[in-house]
Amino acid sequence: MAHTFILESGQWTIEGNWLERNGMLITVKGKTIVTWDRTDWFSMVTKLIFPSQDREDIILQYRGRLDSDERHYTFLLQHSELGKIEGEGWLGINSIIQRYWVLGNDVQRRSGFETLLRLDQERYYFTGGILSGVSLNSAMEATIERQPD
């Protein structure tokens, strides 16, 4: 069973929880749109909203390239809170793992990681976190579900 997230164009919904350091769990919802414009380049746009909180939405705009081995990819990301980001991802048998780091003069040395565990062809379980140096600042866990075309 091949991965469908990232590797196929489509729309996905996100529902889960966000946790800030020293904060309570808050509900997060969102949507991701993945498109492929050439055989090895993809674009992905994600919008996360926090319906029960007075917190700004998070917008993520990716541009990535799948390596010739079709098991690794690299990406550039514009993150509405963190700025310009560079990252890499690995496509495992049952999961997609990626890490990223903030570009430029980032005195906080922010970086992050994400894992998407495939539940079935239409659903993934997402976990990820954002770090400053070696300290975890926030984490998110959510179910990502493909929407019909």
Placement of each model-derived feature along the sequence:
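N-terminal helix-cap/turn-to-beta initiation motif at the start of protein domains
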Residues: 1-11
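Charge-rich amphipathic alpha-helical interaction elements
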Residues: 2, 20, 88, 118-121, ...
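Well-ordered beta-strand positions
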Residues: 6, 35-36, 90, 117-119
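Central antiparallel beta-sheet cores of small beta-barrel/beta-sandwich binding domains
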Residues: 14-15, 19-112, 147
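Edge beta-strand at a domain terminus
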Residues: 113-149
